[in-house]
């Protein structure tokens, strides 16, 4: 007999669709349940106050989980976009490095040097290297105008 009473107390009634609808409506207006509202809802829905309080607590937990999932999806898509942008930029950098190497080799051939131009000489503005830089700029302009440069090349 004692066993059948404890089973009866532990068995919970499911909420009706109307009760759930009213609880949902109230939840959209107030995420936290004030004692007065809890009493009012309890009387209005014919539910124990504790059941109303637990429903709100569970709903807040589900709401937070859903919000975190939405945030996660948003962050994940932003991360994927950033990775895609990074890959495109790396491709552009590689292309520009290759183009610079070709231009330096062309300059080396143009100035009848045996080896490619030393990087440190090209960036210098010393009087000794001014002529070489001017020649490099002219050669690069020629290189670009012949359709080998970035002006006619797509980055895709």
UniProtKB/Swiss-Prot annotation:
* Function comment: Probable transcription factor.
Q: What is the official name of this protein in its record?
A: Homeobox-leucine zipper protein ATHB-52
- Which stretches of sequence are listed as region Leucine-zipper? 68-96
Q: Name one Pfam family in it.
A: Homeodomain
Record's keyword annotation contains Lipid biosynthesis: no
- DNA-binding region location: 8-67
Q: Which UniProt keywords apply?
A: DNA-binding, Homeobox, Nucleus, Transcription, Transcription regulation
In the UniProt record, does the keyword Transcription regulation occur?
Answer: yes
- Give one GO molecular function term: DNA-binding transcription factor activity, RNA polymerase II-specific
Q: Which organism is this protein's natural source?
A: Arabidopsis thaliana
Xref: InterPro entries: HD, HDZip_class_I_plant, Homeobox_CS, Homeodomain-like_sf
Alphabetical list of PANTHER family matching this protein: HOMEOBOX-LEUCINE ZIPPER PROTEIN (PTHR24326), HOMEOBOX-LEUCINE ZIPPER PROTEIN ATHB-52 (PTHR24326:SF522)
Task: Cite a single GO BP annotation.
Answer: response to blue light
* Compartment annotation: Nucleus
Family that this chain belongs to: Belongs to the HD-ZIP homeobox family. Class I subfamily.
Q: Which PROSITE patterns does this chain map to? A: HOMEOBOX_1, HOMEOBOX_2
Q: Name one GO cellular component term.
A: nucleus
Q: Which residues form a coiled coil?
A: none
């Amino acid at each position: 007999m004692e066993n059948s009473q404890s089973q009866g107390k532990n068995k919970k009634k499911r909420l009706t669709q109307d009760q759930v609808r009213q609880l949902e409506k109230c939840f959209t207006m107030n995420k936290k349940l004030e004692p007065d509202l809890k009493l009012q809802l309890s009387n209005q829905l014919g539910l124990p106050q504790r059941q109303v309080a637990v429903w709100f607590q569970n709903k807040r937990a589900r709401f937070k989980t859903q919000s975190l999932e939405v945030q996660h999806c948003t962050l994940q898509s932003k991360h994927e976009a950033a990775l895609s942008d990074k890959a495109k930029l790396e491709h552009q950098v590689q292309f520009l490095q290759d183009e610079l190497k070709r231009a330096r080799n062309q300059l080396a051939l143009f100035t009848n040097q045996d080896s490619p131009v030393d990087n440190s000489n090209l960036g210098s503005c010393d009087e000794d290297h001014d002529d070489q830089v001017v020649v490099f700029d002219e050669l690069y302009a020629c290189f670009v105008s012949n359709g080998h440069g970035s002006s006619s090349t797509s980055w895709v």
